[in-house]
């Protein structure tokens, strides 16, 4: 059984400890197959349980995201406030492209065979209603490091801060207990990166490579990754997202990369991070890491509550007219306790809150 937030809504299984294995699937839905795709949303939890039941100790889970164009085709209701196609970031030197994507499946487990089997079953159930436009098999790399050798996710929020950073509150513009996710596939020029001295690599990140200790602010370069990924309000309040990046690669092709995936209650936080990285802050002061990293894909998805996936039409009907404005916004913020049960799209017991994922920091864009 699943325990809902105090607002009565059950979120998808976004927060959890870093998994050793993951499969990222981005699909497009064939024109005319919208009804099939919508009907399948309620079946996803059952498929996850069927695959994961045979190995509950390996914590199989799946997060489902819906793209803006598919939302318009599937539902008569307006899009959630933050849902729109991924915004291309075209800087003077580097570009973050916007690429097709109607559905996202973020599959995680302790074993790749479980991830693979779930991916196979999900796509098989959808049949010719969908096409796979991107598939990445990710793995955890040496003490939580990325392929470039630096620890990834050090600044991720934890516990209640993670919940508040990720899930939309009751009484806001979005359905409660939902979130937004942005995904990008980056490939790295490892030969050029490894030709740098460790000192130059550390300057690009703003962090020591071996110890993972952050540089003092006065020692960080203005184009360092940490500087450009710190998002603050005018009053100095820092805004964070939760990311679960994974390494991928092929020795045969020589392609090595990082799959970026970032969850946020306010997607503009992640978008401001990307604008800083690619356009620069100020313009032209782009992220030094991009001289060695190329964004190949870019997608933005709405991740509704599990209640919505189980009955989207019912949830949308219940929201008209919405009495959400009369609710206490704080009621959607719930601490994830160690004893919380898994949500329906997870085949295992939940992870302790102090193992929850977190992220680097970001500055909120004025809207």
Curated annotation (Swiss-Prot):
Key words of the record: Encapsulin nanocompartment, Heme, Iron, Metal-binding, Oxidoreductase, Peroxidase
InterPro entries, alphabetized: Dimeric_a/b-barrel (IPR011008), Dyp_perox_C (IPR048328), Dyp_perox_N (IPR048327), Dyp_peroxidase (IPR006314)
Reported uses of this protein in biotechnology and industry: Can be used as a bionanoreactor following immobilization on a glass surface.
GO molecular function: heme binding; metal ion binding; peroxidase activity
Positions annotated to bind heme: 225
Top-level taxon in the UniProt lineage: Bacteria
Cofactor(s) required for function per UniProt: heme b
Tagged with keyword Iron: yes
GO cellular component: cytosol; encapsulin nanocompartment
Bias (Low complexity) ranges: 345-356
Active-site annotation: 152 (proton acceptor)
PROSITE patterns, A to Z: DYP_PEROXIDASE
Keyword Secreted attributed: no
Locations listed in the record: Encapsulin nanocompartment
EC category name: oxidoreductase
Family per similarity comment: Belongs to the DyP-type peroxidase family.
Note on domains (UniProt): The C-terminus (at least 10 residues, not detailed in paper) targets the protein to the nanocompartment.
Its biological purpose: Cargo protein of a type 1 encapsulin nanocompartment. Has both general peroxidase activity and dye-decolorizing activity. Can catalyze the oxidation of both protoporphyrinogen IX and coproporphyrinogen III to their corresponding porphyrins. Also efficiently decolorizes the dyes alizarin red and Cibacron blue F3GA. This cargo-loaded encapsulin nanocompartment is probably involved in protection against oxidative damage.
Name of the protein in question: Dye-decolorizing peroxidase
Upper lineage: Bacteria, Bacillati, Actinomycetota, Actinomycetes, Micrococcales
